[in-house]
């Protein structure tokens, strides 16, 4: 792993030589063959800087990338400190034993990309011994006739990126970026599929101003060529360094609005990027106010709203805890965005260590520090925003659309919100819930703040209620199709929406929609959660609570005969009147099932 520390980024010059500790690319499942070495400009990165002479230092393990903010170049670096003198941070002490994922990731990466020599007993990844890999992609083979390659602007372990000029066609005379992936590097069936998927995602995602524009893909006998928009403004990382290592709050908001906007767009289409970091955001021009573009979809994948991915991918400093636990969705991108905004505001990484094991351990166990400068001088809203993204429980994290509604981002401005897929997931759960749980959620909805109601009202309007201010299943489908791209077909988002069949003959007003669209887990992530819960219980006690026997409660919750009901549920019912207790109310909000009941 690259040296990961919490000192100011202002004095940290990214170099390739700082790879001794590594900046490991944790990319088991979709490490793009042409992934450029950080911090060199990546796929569409044409900051127009000529390639530096010399060959980057090579390492025994071929999947290391340099740390974007190396530290050994200054005296106070943890790299130059003993373990004993390394400063503790938020109770985070060293040395740590390596966490369980660390050792396995290298082996998985090596096997995936064919860098480990197979032994005699190994079976080719294609599943059939001795079967040659098909490296034909069906792309056009007329690249040389249409484009003239120029200087190299970035190089990774599996390919390189060049500036190029279009010789004919609609783009004649225009400069473009070309990601060149040698077929010789595609030594496994998975590596080949990674390239196919990257092109498919780039070609199917279109229409967002903060997404790098894809033009075409070509191939010949030796290479695959991915032609994209040329971004000449450099990386977000370069801008951070140029500003002395961090952004002001106001400038950070401008950056975050763009990042959240494109993230929400991708997530609605069912695409998770899986490698969001400052190096993968480029500015379209050198102008200070130029648009920012997300690039490098080499690790991206399609994900259905109710599906969990299990490939360990990403860059170590930005990888979410659930990725290391091998069960994640689009929430993993929100964690990465949380790391980015932490860096923007203070110039330090929230999770740092001297080794890859330490980084993983920090991500899994440590809490980010808000005690060191400049955090005490930053607004409470900024700190709350970061905390709600860097919550280790992915269920409590904000979505990109919700983050755009956060008081720190929105301020007094009217922000145009995108449709949020979490609304569909929550509505499906609400419709299939018991009548008692729906009553509990309606009580909770009455405690929502103005900012929370603003978000829900915007989502309600995006779904498109009828003249009576009611929404139906058809409204849900129509709203989704208005925002769809070809990526939705691969991610099967529409198939998921079709499963919300129970609402087919129902119409929801805004009050019930608010109850249906509440995430109890996200509410729990608020500092004011206990106040919400107590107030909601008071509403529920007046309007929805009623006497209930244990057997009926078990039926309401769908608990099976294997659950010792009287032992488990006796504290959930008040003995004086037989109504739900506060504990029972809280359990009901979470939708308790047999799987969540502890065994006795």
Swiss-Prot record:
Highly expressed in roots in the zone of cell division. Expressed in leaf mesophyll cells and at lower levels in mature stems. It catalyses: L-seryl-[protein] + ATP = O-phospho-L-seryl-[protein] + ADP + H(+); L-threonyl-[protein] + ATP = O-phospho-L-threonyl-[protein] + ADP + H(+). CDD domains: STKc_CAMK. Keywords: ATP-binding, Calmodulin-binding, Kinase, Nucleotide-binding, Phosphoprotein, Repeat, Serine/threonine-protein kinase, Transferase. The keyword Phosphoprotein applies. GO terms for biological process: intracellular signal transduction. This is Calcium/calmodulin-dependent serine/threonine-protein kinase 1. It comes from Oryza sativa subsp. japonica. The gene is CAMK1.
């Amino acid at each position: 792993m690259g040296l990961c520390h919490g000192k100011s980024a202002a004095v940290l010059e990214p170099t390739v030589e700082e790879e001794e500790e590594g900046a490991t690319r944790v990319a088991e499942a979709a490490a793009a063959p042409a992934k450029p070495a950080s911090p060199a400009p990546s796929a569409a990165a044409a900051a127009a800087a000529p390639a530096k002479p010399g060959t980057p230092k090579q390492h025994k393990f071929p999947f290391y990338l340099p740390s974007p903010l190396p530290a050994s170049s200054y005296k106070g670096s943890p790299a130059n400190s003993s373990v004993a003198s390394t400063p503790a941070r938020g109770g985070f002490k060293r040395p740590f034993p390596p966490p369980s994922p660390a050792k396995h990731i290298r082996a998985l990466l090596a096997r995936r990309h064919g860098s480990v020599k197979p032994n005699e007993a190994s079976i080719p990844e294609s599943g059939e011994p001795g079967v040659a890999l098909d490296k034909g992609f069906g792309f056009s083979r007329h690249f040389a006739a249409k484009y003239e390659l120029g200087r190299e602007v970035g190089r990774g372990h599996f390919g390189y990126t060049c500036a190029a000029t279009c010789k004919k066609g609609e783009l004649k005379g225009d400069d473009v970026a070309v990601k060149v992936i040698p077929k010789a590097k595609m030594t496994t069936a998975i590596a080949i599929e990674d390239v196919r998927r990257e092109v498919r995602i780039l070609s199917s995602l279109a229409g967002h101003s903060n997404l790098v524009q894809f033009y075409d893909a070509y191939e010949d006998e030796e290479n695959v060529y991915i032609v994209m928009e040329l971004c000449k403004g450099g990386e977000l990382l370069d801008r951070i360094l140029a500003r002395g290592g961090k952004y002001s709050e106001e400038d950070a908001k401008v950056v975050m609005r763009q990042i959240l906007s494109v993230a929400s767009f991708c997530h609605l289409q069912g695409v998770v990027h899986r490698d969001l970091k400052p190096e993968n955001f480029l500015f379209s021009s050198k102008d200070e106010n130029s648009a920012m573009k997300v690039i490098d979809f080499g690790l991206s994948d399609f994900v259905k709203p109710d599906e969990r991915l299990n490939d360990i991918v990403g860059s170590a400093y930005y990888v979410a805890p659930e990725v290391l636990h091998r069960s994640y969705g689009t929430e993993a991108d929100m964690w990465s965005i949380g790391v980015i905004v932490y860096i923007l505001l203070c110039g330090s990484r929230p999770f740092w260590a001297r080794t890859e094991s330490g980084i993983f351990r920090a991500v899994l166990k440590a809490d980010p520090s808000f005690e060191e400068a400049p955090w005490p001088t930053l607004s409470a809203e900024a700190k709350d925003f970061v905390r709600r993204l860097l919550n280790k429980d992915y269920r409590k994290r904000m979505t990109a659309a919700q983050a755009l509604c956060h008081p720190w981002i929105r301020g007094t401005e009217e922000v145009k919100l995108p449709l949020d897929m979490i609304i569909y997931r929550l509505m499906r759960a609400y419709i299939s819930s018991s009548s008692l749980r729906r009553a509990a959620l309606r009580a909770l909805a009455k405690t929502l703040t103005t900012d929370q109601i603003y978000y829900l009202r915007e989502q309600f309007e995006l779904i498109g209620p009828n003249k009576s201010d009611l929404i139906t299943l058809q409204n849900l489908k129509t709203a989704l199709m208005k925002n769809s791209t070809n990526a939705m077909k691969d991610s099967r988002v529409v198939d998921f929406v079709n499963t919300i069949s129970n609402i087919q003959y129902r119409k929801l007003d805004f009050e019930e929609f608010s109850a249906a669209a509440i995430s109890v887990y996200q509410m729990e992530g608020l500092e004011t959660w206990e106040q919400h819960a107590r107030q909601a219980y008071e509403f529920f006690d007046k309007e929805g609570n009623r006497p209930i026997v244990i057997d009926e409660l078990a039926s309401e919750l769908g608990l099976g005969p294997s659950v010792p009901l009287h032992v488990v549920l006796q504290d959930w019912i008040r003995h004086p009147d037989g109504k739900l207790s506060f504990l029972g109310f809280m359990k009901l909000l979470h939708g308790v099932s047999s799987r969540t009941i502890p065994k006795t």
